[in-house]
């Protein structure tokens, strides 16, 4: 197996090369690359030379978006074969593209889900099984995406802290207990939320959904959590979708749950990732299976909150019996939503830095787990309702959200399909302003560094106001 690559050549082709090398499990490595890729552009023709040891392969194509795609597709097949993997992955050569976002674009163009999936099959060689899942999700999502009123928005509030770091996580979140600037962060976040309230009122916006994510929002102290939640509750109309990512069961208690219920939260995410204590310890979760079950049972017996549960296929040393146990638990308890993630080996994560990749199950085993989950969940009455893919995912697979009928999380659909403006608060969050029919974006990214966030909050809010004025007052 080869792991590192070095590319030199035209930048437009380099972006395509990077996506396809990532899909084949390779990382950029300028020091000790095992794969050397050299590209040249001469008289309207790209030539890409790939050298792996004594093996040399040359790919050519016209200097155009189609030519770059063709070279990328051929490169991906070659690298997968070199790695001893099937040349054609389930998603074919679809790399660097959100499948459902492309599907909806093609539905707009060609008029039906059937026509759209046919074009995707022809263009990317996607398997019939994945096309069927993609089409079903597109059909389910379409009613959520039909409203083109650009005064309807969703909101996101990010709390960029956890109390431990999972081995697969590459996000630059800090440990809350170690952070010295808590009061400055909370003051800046308060200003951010108050400013968002003013924007909503100034432009007469309707908030469809609000998602409080992270990190782990429930890592905040009870009183701080209540105050932030109270401010957020003023932004979302009563009865509209209001989610709190309570991902770590050890960070949630009855006091926080009472705050959620009193302030209009109607959905939470409880994320076990797996239901085996030995794997939980190995991946750094910091909680037990018992913690998960006690929280879920408390929520079911004492609240009306809808529940999402996240699981990951491909964790270190995970086996099919482990996944069967996970799905047994889901089917016994029937949370409203279940999200099945495929492990992505990300540079910057402890999993990558500690060279634990040898502990990750083989690609075909992860694919079997994902397929098993699909069959068990659909047999239990769940339907797939959103999907996305990431670079470096095991088996070049996908993450899929499943829902019981009528219980889908609309925010998940809107954030993935990018057909509604999503305005965000907090460090590391991103706002995107969208308008039909082009759905082109205006964007603002808040700094990931919490110190920079609170030190520059005035300038950040001024910039957000300028973008809002440009978007809603100049049409």
Predicted regions and their residues:
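Short beta-strand motif preference
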Residues: 48-50, 157, 268-270
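Short, glycine-/Ser/Thr-/acidic-enriched flexible segments
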Residues: 217, 392, 428-431
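Beta-sheet entry/capping signal
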Residues: 152-154, 209, 241, 337, ...
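N-terminal [4Fe-4S]-dependent radical SAM core
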Residues: 82-88, 108-155, 203-204
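A C-terminal junction/extension of Radical SAM enzymes
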Residues: 348-425
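Radical SAM enzyme core and accessory elements
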Residues: 1-101, 105-112, 401, 405-475
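Conserved non-cysteine loop/helix-boundary elements of the Radical SAM core domain that shape
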Residues: 173-372
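Canonical Radical SAM [4Fe-4S] cluster-binding loop centered on the CxxxCxxC motif
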Residues: 150-186
